[in-house]
């Protein structure tokens, strides 16, 4: 099967095009840093495989995700490249295009966001550009799918009759050096003359990954030639001279291809940014938007829908299942397991799906509109005080959905110590798995202020992340403040299709977890409540679950929720935070009183908020721990990522409850 790779600058629509060409769905957002590892999909019509590579501005990598690109181009086999460029930012995008053309591999250029360019008054004669580059160009709008069907039909012809042709003349002295380098590379390695020229050019540009691909003897010979030409070039470095020549080539290439409107025209994005990124009013606007989202999620839309679903699962559905099992003569043990264990456990989590969907819809709306990138800029000013840059806030925002992709997104951070710090604080972000816990307790104890209480927990998670990052960056991960440079995407009206797919994929992951982790956890919790030292079908106070819960309940007694029931829910919470709710449903619903009544009797508003603080901050779930181990390559850092949140959660919850108890 033929392999094709898709390449481009960050946030030019690579993943949108990938989804359109493969029919799959990968996470997209109107901001940079979404793709941090290569993703493989099967092209429609069995054309071949398409590999979506992380966005990069240059083939000389400075971050872990950019390393993936250069490594793939040098070491993997592929039939051609699809270079997607932003038509509204063509001059900057062509910088990467030129480097890819120097590979002298079959290439198609996808001219994306042609609609945005047109709205800005930018006119591009892509036919003329195609003739100049001698490379096929396909105008597309990846977000809507316009032009992608034609591109798909042409991909199978990519490389047919291809003859390497692209070459920039870097001047007599540098070209002579490139020629000598090529001879060494072809003699000492298996690369052909075209690959050798690309390697020589990248070596002269100080691409360290290229140097790492060669043996030390070849590197020494090439370094000697580079030093010689550096003396010949004079005061200007070889790299700077080559970049000057390349920039001149690009300007000449585009001068009669692209026509720009009046430069004095101020775009809509710029006018809006003056308000949304304002250093004084930008943050209050962000908090107000988040309050509106939570108000909609927990008061206006989400909760009423959840109540209806809860009534259906706990009433009609459960009664129907009981009737069917009685008719079939199912033994009492299985009946209890299914109704009191599986339906009670899994159902207690599924009732929050409407709230999850509403929340994900609005987060997807903020992402696709381009607003999320502005939040990173806004937070950069604050995060400098805590030893981080705004680039760390991008993975943190992703953590509102799930902490696992949040940790993986830290690959886009160039500075290794800042990347590691971001990984260690990312689990403090309130992921969707914690939301059912919040929803359950705010619905019982804080009915009039549900959105404000949940917002306070999200803000608390961010504050704790900042405080911990301060400690880390001043002690074991000392680091100079990094400069944060980010491209602000154009504001756009999100498409209904994109919003629906994004919301559905996120919600689907939540439901899928209900069918795996939560299902398994519910069965185990119910069995532990069913079995005890004295046999089976024991009173829950004589069960193994009571024994385990009593031990942990004793440990958290100073935190305000030291019952055996609360203690028993904390252990399976390591598996997945949603299991906390399913465990409560099984434990608290085992008696005559309902779940809500029992929680009201065993918690107060103060202890309920203390419990939510503890759930927010304590041990990350097992999937997050696995992601931390994968990204840090260290059991030491993984152990720290498990231990310090537990200590932090205990200390902060203890202080909150004990101080609050003095006033309540």
Curated annotation (Swiss-Prot):
Segments crossing the lipid bilayer: 281-301, 342-362, 382-402, 425-445, 452-472, 516-536, 544-564, 567-587, 608-628, 637-657
Domain FeoB-type G: 1-161
One Gene Ontology molecular-function label: GTP binding
Top-level taxonomic group: Bacteria
Binding sites annotated in the UniProt record for GTP 3: 52-55
Residue numbers binding GTP: 112-115, 141-143
Residues reported to bind GTP 1: 8-15
Binding annotation for GTP 2: 33-37
Membrane topology: Multi-pass membrane protein
PROSITE patterns membership: G_FEOB (PS51711)
Entry similarity comment: Belongs to the TRAFAC class TrmE-Era-EngA-EngB-Septin-like GTPase superfamily. FeoB GTPase (TC 9.A.8) family.
Main function: Probable transporter of a GTP-driven Fe(2+) uptake system.
Protein name, per record: Fe(2+) transporter FeoB
Source organism: Staphylococcus aureus (strain N315)
Lineage of producing organism: Bacteria, Bacillati, Bacillota, Bacilli, Bacillales
